[in-house]
């Protein structure tokens, strides 16, 4: 019976997946519409339709990109899950009442899809041209398709209000806040092949703009780009520090004020528990034997007065109590670390889940740093990373890391697992790195790949 209930519940959940995904995409489209109506007079989110500062526009554009990404992902889930559910549905003759309900449900789905299409049609691009300048700046231009359809908002009770007539907006060009060159340079060397190298032509154009008083690259545009870059840098550094500080602070607070007292109380109630694994027990015995042998040795050579058997046993007993207390505390610390790390991981996940806009900004910031490096610097970092983690001497480092992790969690050292991990994980890591070099870096920066190969040889 339990198995049948589980299967029935799973089937119900799967059958509702398309509608659930569509509802999430629909809510994201409503958010975009609300953003347009509240801050952009019902027009598209763009610097051309409202007068806002750089920081405000960056915030609005980050909100927009998050909603558009949500719509894209959830519509993909809707299409995929609907395909599976349609294949798994049995074909039986439909009752008239059920047929009417299904037709009404289908109409609501179509209305939601139409509304989503109306909203995102403003932000679908007809043409995107990208060029890389000598300082690795990125130029983006986009033509936006006009909105020629009516927008329909579906209420929560499933009723569809009459559509409002809207005048189609003329297509306008969207200027990204991270534009590094004017848009009239978009038709430069990206689509043409000339005698001179592209970087040389881009350098000449940049110098011409800097010395030409009538150039479109005005001081105001330069200041705007600088403010945007400074804003992105500040947000990125704050977010990276937040990712480090919040988990560490959570770990220390939960371990100190909650976990350690609970584990200590458990050990005090179970005094027979001294060692949490055999490795710690063997270490304690070795330490006790070493102390006893050192005591005999010092007594024989006259460093300490000659001790009787009772005095030796007394010293050994005191040392055993000291070792017992030490390893008991180590066990308490290890158990507390396990749960404190779980709380830290939860805190880290919460920060990630609630900071999607900051993640996009950090990604853009790190991409700018990475791709602004010279080819030699990129090759040096790749070689350093590979030699450190997948190189000839990396097994020793991985062994130290695995032993430290086992000690941190109070786990007994497993040599077989360590050897298996060292034999497989660096190979997987090396394969992923080579694929990244072949798939992405070779396309973005071929000269960096050539420099890497020359330096590696």
UniProtKB/Swiss-Prot annotation:
Keywords: Cell inner membrane, Cell membrane, Hydrogen ion transport, Ion transport, Membrane, Transmembrane, Transmembrane helix, Transport
InterPro entries associated with the record: CemA (IPR004282)
Domain of life, per lineage: Bacteria
Chief localisation class: membrane
Location(s) in or outside the cell: Cell inner membrane
GO terms for cellular component: plasma membrane
One Pfam match: CemA
HAMAP family recorded: CemA_PxcA (MF_01308)
Family listed: Belongs to the CemA family.
Function: Required for H(+) efflux immediately after light irradiation to form a rapid H(+) concentration gradient across the thylakoid membranes. Together with PxcL, contributes to transient H(+) uptake following dark to light transition.
Protein name (record): Proton extrusion protein PxcA
């Amino acid at each position: 019976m339990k198995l049948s209930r589980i299967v029935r519940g799973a089937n119900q959940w799967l059958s509702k997946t398309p509608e659930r995904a569509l509802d999430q995409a629909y809510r994201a489209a409503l958010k975009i519409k609300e953003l347009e109506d509240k801050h952009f007079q019902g027009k598209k989110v763009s610097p051309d339709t409202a007068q806002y500062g750089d920081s405000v526009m960056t915030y609005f554009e980050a909100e927009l990109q998050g909603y558009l990404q949500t719509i894209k992902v959830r519509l993909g889930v809707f299409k995929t899950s609907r395909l599976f559910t349609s294949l798994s549905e049995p074909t039986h003759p439909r009752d008239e009442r059920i047929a009417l309900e299904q037709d009404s449900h289908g109409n609501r789905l179509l209305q939601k899809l139409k509304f989503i299409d109306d909203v995102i049609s403003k932000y679908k691009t007809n043409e995107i041209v990208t060029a890389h300048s000598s300082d690795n700046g990125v130029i983006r231009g986009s033509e936006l398709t006009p909105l020629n359809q009516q927008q329909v908002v579906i209420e929560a009770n499933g009723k569809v209000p009459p559509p409002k007539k809207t005048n189609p907006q003329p297509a306008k060009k969207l200027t990204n806040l991270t534009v590094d060159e004017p848009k009239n340079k978009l038709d430069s060397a990206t689509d043409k092949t000339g005698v001179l190298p592209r970087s040389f032509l881009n350098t000449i154009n940049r110098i011409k703009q800097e010395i030409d008083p009538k150039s479109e690259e005005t001081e105001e545009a330069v200041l705007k780009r600088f403010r945007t870059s400074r804003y992105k840098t500040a947000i990125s550094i704050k977010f990276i520090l937040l990712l480090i500080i919040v988990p560490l602070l959570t770990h220390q607070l939960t371990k100190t004020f909650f976990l350690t007292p609970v584990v200590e109380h458990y050990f005090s109630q179970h005094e027979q528990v001294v060692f949490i694994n055999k490795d710690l027990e063997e270490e304690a015995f070795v330490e006790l034997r070493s102390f006893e042998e050192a005591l005999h040795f010092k007594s024989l050579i006259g460093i300490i007065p000659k001790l009787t058997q009772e005095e030796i046993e007394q010293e050994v007993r005191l040392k055993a109590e000291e070792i017992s207390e030490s390893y008991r505390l180590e066990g308490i610390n290890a158990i507390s670390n396990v749960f404190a790390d779980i709380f830290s991981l939860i805190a880290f996940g919460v920060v990630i889940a609630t900071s999607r806009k900051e993640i996009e900004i950090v990604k853009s910031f790190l991409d700018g740093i990475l791709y602004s490096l010279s080819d030699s610097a990129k090759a040096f970092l790749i070689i350093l990373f590979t030699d450190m983690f997948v190189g000839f001497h990396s097994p020793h480092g991985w062994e130290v890391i695995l032993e430290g992790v086992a000690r941190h969690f109070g786990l007994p050292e497993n040599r077989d697992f360590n050897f298996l991990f060292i034999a497989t994980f660096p190979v997987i890591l090396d394969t992923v790195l080579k694929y990244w070099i072949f798939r992405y870096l070779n396309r973005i920066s071929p000269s960096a790949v050539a420099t890497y190969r020359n330096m590696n040889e």
